[in-house]
């Protein structure tokens, strides 16, 4: 699945879309099916495993130098929080590069990437975990669960830079409701499994 967040640090801030794969397999799909018109900048913890976080720049923005510092901080915090090692550290270095600078070949493991040019890579420091920022972002999260690769493929065919902005805006309510139903189903299944386990334990005790 793929997660979509909205970075809007203040009431009057211009909203930015942040995208992140749930795991290394979805991260590979984002690398494979993204396209230049999306204008993505990629964030990843330096020297540690972490989430692959993408920030969508606006059409008139070329680099992170054009982005409000508060929005960059949101991306840094989200990336650091999705690193097991980095999340425990008081400070963590984050690698930043445009999506089109990522290199992926068939010999690499899922989640592994290299770069076409190190000159296009930058590093920024992220401080200690900021729960205020992370809680704000979590409230905006929308989950694309079904037909992920097909949807990414459809987007790439259009070459529309605003495909996912429009998609999330049009389908937000349905996607949120679908996620709620999945959580309920998962909770019910967990209860059912526990009941089955308890019944087996009771049967074993009776046999003894």
Curated annotation (Swiss-Prot):
Annotated localization: Cytoplasm
Biased composition (Basic residues): 185-194
GO CC annotation terms, alphabetical: cytoplasm
Pfam families assigned: NFACT-R_1 (PF05670)
Annotated spans, Disordered: 185-208
Keyword Disulfide bond: no
Annotated keywords: Cytoplasm
Listed transmembrane segments: none
Other comments on record: Present with 3060 molecules/cell in log phase SD medium.
Family: Belongs to the CCDC25 family.
Protein name per its UniProtKB record: Protein JLP2
Organism for this UniProt entry: Saccharomyces cerevisiae (strain ATCC 204508 / S288c) (Baker's yeast)
Gene expressing this chain: JLP2
């Amino acid at each position: 699945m793929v997660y979509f967040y909205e970075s809007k640090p203040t009431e009057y801030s211009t909203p930015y879309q942040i995208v992140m794969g749930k795991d290394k397999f979805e991260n590979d799909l984002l690398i494979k099916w993204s396209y230049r018109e999306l204008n993505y900048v990629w964030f990843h913890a330096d020297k540690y495993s972490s989430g692959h976080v993408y920030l969508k720049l606006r059409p008139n923005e070329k680099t992170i130098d054009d982005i409000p510092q508060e929005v960059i901080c949101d991306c840094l915090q989200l990336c650091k929080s999705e690193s097991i090692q980095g999340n425990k550290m008081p400070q963590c270095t984050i690698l930043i590069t445009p999506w089109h600078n990522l290199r992926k070949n068939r010999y690499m493991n899922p989640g592994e990437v290299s770069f076409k040019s190190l000159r296009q890579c930058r590093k920024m420091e992220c401080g200690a975990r900021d729960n205020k920022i992370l809680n704000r972002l979590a409230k905006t999260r929308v989950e694309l669960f079904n037909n992920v690769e097909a949807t990414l493929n459809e987007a790439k065919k259009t070459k529309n830079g605003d495909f996912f902005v429009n998609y999330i805006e049009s389908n937000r309510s349905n996607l949120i409701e679908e996620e709620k139903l999945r959580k309920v189903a998962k909770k019910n299944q967990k209860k059912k499994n526990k009941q089955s386990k308890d019944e087996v334990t009771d049967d074993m005790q009776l046999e003894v």
